[in-house]
Structures are given as C-alpha cells and as structure tokens.
Curated annotation (Swiss-Prot):
It catalyses: NAD(+) + (deoxyribonucleotide)n-3'-hydroxyl + 5'-phospho-(deoxyribonucleotide)m = (deoxyribonucleotide)n+m + AMP + beta-nicotinamide D-nucleotide. Coiled coil: none annotated. The lineage of its organism: Bacteria, Pseudomonadati, Thermomicrobiota, Thermomicrobia, Thermomicrobiales. This is DNA ligase. CDD domains: BRCT_DNA_ligase_like, LIGANc. GO terms for biological process: DNA repair; DNA replication. InterPro entries: BRCT_dom, BRCT_dom_sf, DisA/LigA_HHH, DNA_ligase, DNA_ligase_AS, DNA_ligase_CS, DNAligase_adenylation, DNAligase_N. SMART domains: BRCT, HhH1, LIGANc. DNA ligase that catalyzes the formation of phosphodiester linkages between 5'-phosphoryl and 3'-hydroxyl groups in double-stranded DNA using NAD as a coenzyme and as the energy source for the reaction. It is essential for DNA replication and repair of damaged DNA. NAD(+) binds at residues 44-48, 93-94, 124, 147, 187, 304, 328. Belongs to the NAD-dependent DNA ligase family. LigA subfamily. The active site is at residue 126. The keyword Ligase applies. Zn(2+) binds at residues 422, 425, 440, 445.
Length: 695
C-alpha cells in the first residue's frame, strides 16, 4: 500500500509530464500578456486549445492535478466564513501629505534623520482598492490574506486564486532566483470601465449597485463563494514585498518592483525614480493632472525611500513608516443646486444644518446632502435655498458646501429659515452664551435619544456589538428604549416578535448588551455624552475621582484641579451631575449592575515603581508605541497622564518632533525624558512593553 503513490506516479509518461509543465508555463505567460500587458501574442482560439489540452491530460492523469494548475483557479466550495491570518510583518498604513510644502517637510525629515542629502525616492500611483498579501512558498501561491487592521487579516486564498492576473506559480526567467518564502503585497482593484459594466449588468438584473470601484473590489474579494469572486473583473497590482527568506532581497525599492515584474507579477504602473524632492513634486503634479483619465481609481501618489536598508533604519511611528508617505489628491469638487436646508439634532441637542442637494456624482459617489456646520457658516457663505454651490468631498469622505455661485441666481432663491423650534420635538431652541450653535433643550427629544443611544453603544463607548443605527433607531421608534438605562431592561419577548429578529440574533444582542455592563469606568463616562467630555476627558475624570459617587459630589473647584480642565468643561460636568434627571439615570444604571467605579483603584494605589503617582505628559511621536498604547501603559504603572504641562508635572516624555509642550517644560524646568527612559521606567514598573506594542 505504501508504494501505491509511487506506482501511480510512474504511470505518467515523462513526455506527458513535460508537456503538462510546458502548457502551464505557456498559459501563465499568455495570461500575463493578456491581463497585465494588454498585448496578447496568441488568439483566443489558440489559448482555449492549450487550456483544453491541459484539462484533458489532467483528466487522463489525475495525479498531475496540483493547486497551482491554471485549471484549478475556481473549484473550492463556498466557505462558512474566513479564517484569520496573523501578518508576521505588519502591513502598515501610510501617513498623508496634502501640499508641495508638506512633501518638502516630509523629505526634510528624511534627510535630517538619515544624515544624508542624496536620498532617492520612488513615486507610484496609490491605487484605490483592497490591500492584500500573497504568500509564495517554493514558487507556489499558498495563501492570500486581506490587510485587515495591519496585524490580523482574513484568509481569502481561494478567492485570490480566481484573479487571473495573479500567478498561481512563479516561473522565473533564467538567472533569476525566487526565494523559498516570498510575500508579495499589493492592491486588488477594479478598473473604472469594468466597474461601470458590472453596475450596468447588476442594474439590469435588479441587484443593488456598488457605490464605487473600491467597494466593488472589496465586496467581490470577500465573497464566501469563490465562484462569485471569479465572475467579477478583479485586478491586482503589487507595490512591495513582506516576508523574504532564503536569499538576499533587492537593495532598492525600484529593484524590488523590477524583480516582481520578471516573475510576471503585475506591479503598480508607471513608477518613477526621483533623485530630488523637486522631481517628486513634479511627479505628484503629473499624476494629479491625469487623475481623471486613468483606467483605475487613484486617490494619491505613494512616495517611498528607494534604499531599502535606509527605509528600515528610518523606522516606524505608530503604524506609519517614516520612509514612505502618500500625497493625497485634493478632494473632488462639483457644482450642484441646494434644494433645501434641513436641521439634524444630535445627542447634546445641537442643531446642524444640512444642505439637500440636487444629486451629483463626486469621486464615484452620489452626493445628495452636505454639511453646513452651523448658522454662522450659512451667513458666511451667503447661502440661499436654490443657490448653485460648490460641493467638496473633504478627504473624499464627508461632503461639504464650500462656496456659493451668486452670479447664477435667477431671483427664485429664498433665505434659509433658522429654526426657533426643534424640528423633531417642537421645543424652543436656545443659543448658549459664547457659542454659535443652536440647541434643542428637551432631554426627551426623540432625535436626541436616538443619537444618544448610538453614541452610548459605539465602539469607543460601551461597544455593544450588533446595536447599530438601524436597530437602535427602531427600538426608540417603537418605544422599546425611552431612556439610556432602558437598554438593560429590554423586553426581549417583544423583540422576538419583530420582523427580522430571530432567536439567535436576539440572543447575541442580549449577550452583547449584558457584557457592556463591565466596561471600564472611563468608557461609561464617555458613553453618557456629557458636553465637552470626550474620551480623554472621560479618562481624566475616571483617574481623578475613581467612582461615580465621588464624581457626582465634585465641586467646580475640584473639577478645575484636573490638569487640562478649563471653566467650560468643569461647568458642563458639574451641571450634568446636578441635574436631577441625570442623577436618577445614574441610580438606574447602578441598580441594573453597570460598573461605575475603577475596580483597579486599590491595585493602582499599591503600584511600586518610578511612575507611581507621577503626573506625566507625552509630546512628539513615539517609535515603539502608539500614543494611546503609551497612555494606557502609563496609567497601569500608576501615573496620571495629562494634556498640558504645569508646575505640577513630574515628567515630560518627548518623542520625535516634539511640540510646544517641550518648550513649556523647558520654561518651567520640568524634567524632559526620552522614549528610552519611558520604556525603561515602564519595565521597572512591571509593565510588559513588548507585548503591549504587538497588541
């Protein structure tokens, strides 16, 4: 029995084995010519004949079938979900620059940190798609993974195998050595023309349309059924390498891209070597001018240090490499007409004017509404309903009215009505002294409640998975939730009667809400939605008072003792906890078992180490930790982290490019320490810095 595989393999004639290998090599080459170079050298009939011959040989000799055969691109059954993949080398995100001056400033930092003025750069288009990692072992594609959060992604191997631009096996030309382990990183995307055709076909079939090529590419790659992915016109462009084991990697980024091209791996188009920052800027301008004529969506230009050793030596800040950045194109702008102005109501009661627009496509997205911020902005713009306006998708995400075009008025325009009553509940609106915003003062306003519930359940607050905007708004509309504490007294029997709420979905939501009772005290304070209390101020309140009882009895003077708290913040917190309805709400939360104290208070008080009880400030960029990681570790070491430097500050920890806090510390004579001091003191306090940095 043990010899059977050998006997089976022996039955394949050597000439057949050689022909099959030749067919696979030819088909891979013709795929590259057709899909990547757009310059086929054989007809479709000739290509089909080769594929048919290969299939027949594999049918006759099944033992010849391997996962990297071109016949096996589609064949995996639908999956129930995606497994997770840990990236051994993190897939870092890039920082952004938005102007010539910022490009020069970034390059100057590179010059200064490297001690060199002869640094070369490579520019390439920032293809707008989904970042993926392709892992080859001994030249065979063994894994495809999405970028995810940069550290953990999803295994989409069966799906990337369906993309014909991606070689399943590498056939290096003579003299080129493929390392035993090679990770290729790049972008899965969709050409604009292919995207438009796909949407046209979906429209004819009555299916929902994709918003833009990036969404189409991401949605197509993350299909559980690989055959669906195979039916979509996905493309791939490599922009770097990750893992490289067994041989010496190329010395430059330019050589890396050329190496990938030799392996018939498609790379980002039209990359250029630049020997000065002036050349870099010229290339960015060139790409910006031809942006709208590109076959693919690009939202900027990637600029990388060419020397790979220097790139590595420059290191990382947070999740961004110092040796690369992205020049982002200016946001798309279009002209359209304002048909109306409506007012939305937020959780604090703030009324925000929103322009209702004649629909206009900006950057592949149909924009129908745009923010106007407040009534002062309406006055500044001189906006009238019916005006022609310039709308910008700021950062290619948030639409905003940036200008009016008065010369296009025809006399039918009318002024914008400033609401004296809340558009939702009818309460008389108010303006607080010194503020430009108008507020609905009614705490029971349905719009305020909806916004409050969404905020309370959000990821950075109580993090209630599954309680999104649609469900939370529905629960408010149906009266299932009439106040925030009602979240913990939901009538689940009633919810089960609602359409779309099966037992499993309801049970998962119930468990998520129950689990949120044990969130840290600071998160609970942030979730309450107190004016002027964001995540940082919520943490400061939790650190200072340690429990809701002490906080509720705090005076304004006590609140002002918190570093960074000014009169407006102190007054807002004081008034919130003096309001009888809010105190009643807190007591309901207490009865329902919500955590409202720092349970670690005793442990923190007994922390031994150089940071225990110290007031510290962070400034500049850290290489080892993100700012939030550093703050969390300092708190665990017993330190109080504040935003501003005062005579009460014990230490200022300064990273790269420190700001005004550094100068203030010098003026006050506050000890200034570096990142190495920070890491050493954390370790002396018993903190595992390396484990935290990897998390």
């Amino acid at each position: 029995m043990a010899e059977q595989p050998a006997l089976q393999a022996d039955r394949v004639p050597p000439e057949v084995r050689a022909r099959v290998e030749e067919l696979r090599r030819l088909i891979q080459r013709y795929n590259y010519e057709y899909y990547v170079l757009n310059a086929p050298t054989v007809s479709d009939a000739e290509y089909d004949a080769l594929m048919l011959e290969l299939r027949r040989w594999e049918e006759q000799y099944p033992e010849l079938v391997t996962p990297d055969s071109p016949t096996q691109r589609v064949g995996a059954p639908p999956a129930e979900g995606f497994a997770t993949v840990q990236h051994e080398i993190p897939m870092l995100s890039l920082g952004n620059v938005f102007s010539d001056g910022e490009i020069r400033a970034w390059a100057e930092r590179v010059y200064r940190l490297s001690g060199r003025q002869d640094v070369e750069f490579v520019t390439e288009p920032k293809v707008d798609g989904l970042a993926v990692s392709l892992l080859y072992r001994d030249g065979v594609l063994v894994r495809g993974a999405t970028r995810g959060d940069g550290y953990t992604g999803e295994d989409v191997t069966n799906n990337v195998r369906t993309i014909r631009m991606i070689p399943l096996r590498l056939y290096p030309p003579e003299g080129v050595i493929v390392p035993p382990v090679l990770e290729v990183r790049g972008e899965v995307y969709m050409n604009v023309r292919d995207f438009e055709r796909l949407n046209r076909e979906r429209g004819e079939q009555g299916l929902p349309l994709f918003a833009n090529p990036r969404n189409a590419a991401a949605g197509s790659l993350r299909q559980l059924d690989p055959s669906v992915t195979a039916s979509r016109p996905l493309r791939f462009a490599a922009w770097d390498i990750g893992l490289w084991e067994g041989t010496e990697p190329p010395a430059t980024h330019l050589a890396t891209l050329e190496f990938l091209r030799q392996l018939q791996i498609p790379v980002v188009p039209d990359y250029r070597l630049c020997r000065s920052v002036d050349e870099v800027i010229a290339e960015c301008h060139r790409w910006q001018e031809r942006r709208d004529a590109l076959e693919f969506e690009a939202d900027g230009v990637v600029i990388k240090v060419n020397d790979r050793a220097l790139y590595q030596a420059l290191g990382v800040v947070g999740r961004e490499p110092r040796g690369a950045t992205a020049y982002k194109f200016p946001a798309h702008e279009k002209t359209t007409i304002v048909r109306d102005v409506i007012w939305s109501v937020g959780r604090t009661g703030k009324l925000t004017p929103v322009a209702v627009l004649e629909p206009v496509e900006i950057g592949g997205v149909i924009v129908e509404r745009a923010t106007l911020h407040n009534e002062e902005e309406i006055r500044r713009l001189g906006l009238l309903i019916g005006d022609a306006v310039v709308v910008q998708r700021r950062g290619d995400v948030i639409p905003k009215v940036v200008a009016t075009i008065p010369q296009r008025r025809d006399g039918d325009e009318r002024p914008v009505d400033i609401p004296r009553q809340c558009p939702v509940c009818g309460a008389h609106t108010i303006r607080l002294e010194g503020e430009v915003d108008r507020y609905c003062p009614n705490p029971n306003c349905p719009a305020r409640l909806k916004a409050s519930v969404r905020h309370f359940a959000s990821r950075n607050a109580m993090d209630i998975e599954g309680l999104g905007e649609k469900i939370s708004d529905l629960f408010v509309d149906l009266g299932i939730i009439r106040s925030l504490p009602d979240l913990y007294e939901i009538d689940w029997a009633r919810v089960l009667q609602l359409e779309g709420f099966g037992p499993k979905k309801v049970e998962n939501l119930r468990k998520a809400i129950e689990a949120s009772k044990n969130r840290p005290f600071a998160r609970f304070l942030f979730a309450l939605g107190i004016r002027h209390v964001g995540e940082r101020n919520a943490q400061l309140l939790a650190d200072h008072f340690r429990s809701i009882d002490r906080l509720m009895e705090a005076t304004i003077d006590e609140l002002l003792q918190i570093p960074g708290f000014g009169p407006a913040v102190a007054q807002s917190v004081f008034e919130f906890f003096r309001e009888p309805k809010n105190r009643e709400m807190i007591e309901r939360f207490r009865r329902l078992g919500v955590r409202m104290a720092e349970e670690e208070a005793a442990a923190v008080a007994t922390v031994q180490g150089p940071l225990a009880g110290k007031t510290v400030v962070l400034t500049g960029r850290l290489e080892t930790l993100t700012r939030s990681q550093a703050e969390e570790l300092l708190r665990r070491a017993g330190a109080h982290v504040t935003d501003s430097v005062s005579r009460k500050t014990d230490y200022v920890f300064a990273g790269a490019d420190p700001g005004s806090k550094y100068v203030r510390a010098q003026q006050l004579g506050v000890p200034i320490l570096g990142e190495e001091d920070l890491l050493r003191m954390l370790r002396e306090s018993g903190i595992e810095v390396e484990a935290a940095a990897r998390s």
